[in-house]
Curated annotation (Swiss-Prot):
Gene3D superfamilies: 3.30.70.60. One of its GO terms (biological process) is translation. PANTHER family: MITOCHONDRIAL 28S RIBOSOMAL PROTEIN S6, SMALL RIBOSOMAL SUBUNIT PROTEIN BS6M. The keyword Ribosomal protein applies. It comes from Dinoroseobacter shibae (strain DSM 16493 / NCIMB 14021 / DFL 12). This is Small ribosomal subunit protein bS6. NCBIfam families: S6. The gene is rpsF. It comes from the Bacteria. GO terms for molecular function: small ribosomal subunit rRNA binding; structural constituent of ribosome. Belongs to the bacterial ribosomal protein bS6 family. Keywords: Ribonucleoprotein, Ribosomal protein, RNA-binding, rRNA-binding.
Length: 117
């Protein structure tokens, strides 16, 4: 099955638990359609470069999936219809890199720098 990476931004007024439950919800949509979530990361509440739907911040989430194209299309369709999801981006990749994503690596590096001071 093809490999995909998805990033979506949800509204800023959601709690962290609600934003993380969206990841689980869309993972179950994939599972119902014959796919699976290989890895998921919640990147947290981040400030955006510009407003989207009158929101200056958003909860970012990242999914690595292994799913057939119809399952991904159904998940994207439901994401775009969901009121809490503001933006969705999906890319097809040849392979999933091992370890955490670049965003999570940056956070770990920042924590290491603070410890050295």
């Amino acid at each position: 099955m093809p490999l995909y990476e998805h990033v979506f931004i949800s509204r800023q007024d959601l709690s962290n638990a609600q934003a993380e439950s969206l990841v689980e919800h869309f993972g179950s949509v994939l599972a119902d359609n014959g796919g699976k979530v290989v890895d998921s990361e919640y990147w947290g509440l981040k400030t955006m470069a510009y407003k989207i739907n009158k929101n200056r911040k958003g909860h970012y989430a990242f999914l690595k999936t292994d799913a057939p194209a119809p399952a991904v299309q159904e998940m994207e369709r439901l994401m775009r219809l969901h009121d809490d999801v503001m933006r969705v981006m999906t890319i097809k990749v040849d392979e999933h890199p091992e370890g955490p994503s670049i965003q999570m690596q940056k956070r770990e590096e920042r924590d290491n720098r603070r410890e050295r001071r």
